[in-house]
Structure formats: C-alpha cells, structure tokens
Amino acid sequence: MSHRIDNLPNVFNLPFKPNFACELDLQKQGFLYIAGVDEVGRGPLAGPVVTAAVILDKNRIPDGLNDSKKLSAQRRYELYHEILQSALAISIASLCARTIDQSDIRKATLEAMRRCIRGLAVPAHYALVDGRDIPFQLPCPATALIKGDQRSVSIAAASIIAKVTRDQMMECAGQVYKGYGLEKHVGYATLAHRAALEKYGPVVGLHRYSFAPLKKRYRDYMS
C-alpha cells in the first residue's frame, strides 16, 4: 500500500498542547480510526526500543495528554492507566539490543512501529507517526509528523504507553542485572551507568554493542 507524506508542519509553530485537530481533519476525509504511533528508547546504551500505536476514542480522550517527556513519572503512570481504559485499541512492539546491533536503531525502530500498527485489534484507517520516517509495508496510509507528540493527542498517548512500558521493562531488568542501576537510568548513558560498565562490563543481549562508547571497545563482538 502506498503512503502519503504530507508537507511536514512548521516545528516552530507548535500548539500550546497536543490536540485532536489532525485526527478530526482525517476523519472528515473518511478515515475513521486514526492511530498515533511513537517510540521510546532510540538513544540508550541498554535495553530495547519500544513502540506503541494508540487509537483514541474521540469521546473519551484523557485530560492532560502530552509528550511523555514533559510529564512527571507519576502523571505518566496515571495517564497510562487512563489510556488503557479508554482507548479503542493499543498495540505495543519492542526489539531487543541484539536486533538493534544486527540492523541499526533507525531500521529497528521502523520495524517495531510497523509491527505495532499491524498488531492493532481495531485496524487503523490512517497512522500519524512521530518523526520524519514512515515504516514500509503498513496496512494503511500514514503521515510523519515532526514533534508529533506535541501536536497530536494520539501520538502523545502512544508516547506515554511506550515510555511507561519501557521503564517497566528496564525496572525488571534491573532486578536481574544488579549493580547497573537500570531501574534508575533505564539504560541511558548516565555517569553511573558508564561507571558500572567500566566495573562490570556490558551484558550480552542487554547492552547495545553498536553504540558508542561500547562500539570501539568491543569491536570484536560486532565482527
């Protein structure tokens, strides 16, 4: 199926908060079920990249939806449960560090997005994807929106689902791999994480050997 990529919006003209305007415009064009799609975890040294697709019920949109990075952990958690209870459909997909190393983070992210869109229990008629890129082989048309999580409440909802899901995964990983502080930094390259890597070394299957600073030091693993 071909995909429509509209002219990307002016990122310097963001709304005060995400809204449902893009979705309403698409619904007027005949696209009833609009999926917002976002990712979390492109940059960390450890853990998966997680994507989510969310189709909101326009009559039950939770108050306060916003880019997950702009919300406190407590507010994200509250909205996470509100989205779970009110959305028409939610799908989550993740790809592990080893898969990221075998392809690259961009390809892995797009593949995870493709999987979560295709995994929606209510098939999407259209997808709004955060960022510049659109996955291939989608079951519906799609548009990429730069800073989409600050424009579309559907994308904002997806960012919250993906963020809370990934944080929970990394908290579980922290219980298994003691000493790395994964439950605190969730895999990002903090000073504490770098110090733990110096002390213990990376964990195969958890850490991304294709990412600096691991890439140069563990080049043999990647060969």
UniProtKB/Swiss-Prot annotation:
It comes from the Bacteria. GO terms for cellular component: cytoplasm; ribonuclease H2 complex. HAMAP family: RNase_HII_B (MF_00052_B). Its main location: cytoplasm. GO terms for molecular function: manganese ion binding; RNA binding; RNA-DNA hybrid ribonuclease activity. The keyword Metal-binding applies. It is found in: Cytoplasm. This is Ribonuclease HII. It comes from Bartonella henselae (strain ATCC 49882 / DSM 28221 / CCUG 30454 / Houston 1) (Rochalimaea henselae). A divalent metal cation binds at residues 38-39, 130. GO terms for biological process: DNA replication, removal of RNA primer; mismatch repair. Pfam families: RNase_HII (PF01351).
